[in-house]
Curated annotation (Swiss-Prot):
It comes from Corynebacterium diphtheriae (strain ATCC 700971 / NCTC 13129 / Biotype gravis). NCBIfam families: PRK00033.1-1. InterPro entries: ClpS, ClpS_core, Ribosomal_bL12_C/ClpS-like. Involved in the modulation of the specificity of the ClpAP-mediated ATP-dependent protein degradation. Belongs to the ClpS family. GO terms for biological process: protein catabolic process; proteolysis. Binds to the N-terminal domain of the chaperone ClpA. It comes from the Bacteria. Transmembrane segments: none annotated. This is ATP-dependent Clp protease adapter protein ClpS.
């Protein structure tokens, strides 16, 4: 191929640079575009204050989970230290975090993947 350059490394392997490589700006644009499309997650963290029954109650009343699902999420928080309890658009997840804070739970949000 005209204009292609070949280099040989220390092991004698021919390294060809004939393939086009994206510029740094193109790589960053792809990364930004894909991260903007990721959903947001509301994460509840284990704390030493709230009873397990209360956390289950909050998941039912604030997030609308059934008793069974609320209990599963509470047990995940208790055993693993955290659980994703909701996800979606940033505004919705931010509202969930605020409601959980009002109820006294430790909650944060992050963009997921």
């Amino acid at each position: 191929m005209y204009g292609a350059t070949n280099d040989v490394n220390a092991l004698g392997v021919v390294l060809s640079s004939s393939m086009a490589t994206p510029s740094l700006d193109e790589e960053m644009a792809v990364e930004v575009a894909s991260s903007e499309n990721l959903p947001w997650m509301c994460i509840v963290w284990d704390d030493p204050v709230n009873l397990m029954s209360y956390v289950t109650y909050v998941f039912q009343t604030i997030l609308g989970y059934s008793k069974k699902r609320a209990t599963e999420l509470m047990m995940q928080v208790h055993t693993e230290g955290k659980a994703v309890v909701s996800s979606g658009e940033r505004d919705k997840v931010e509202a969930d975090v605020k409601k959980l804070h009002t109820a006294g739970l430790w909650a944060t949000m992050q963009q997921g993947g």
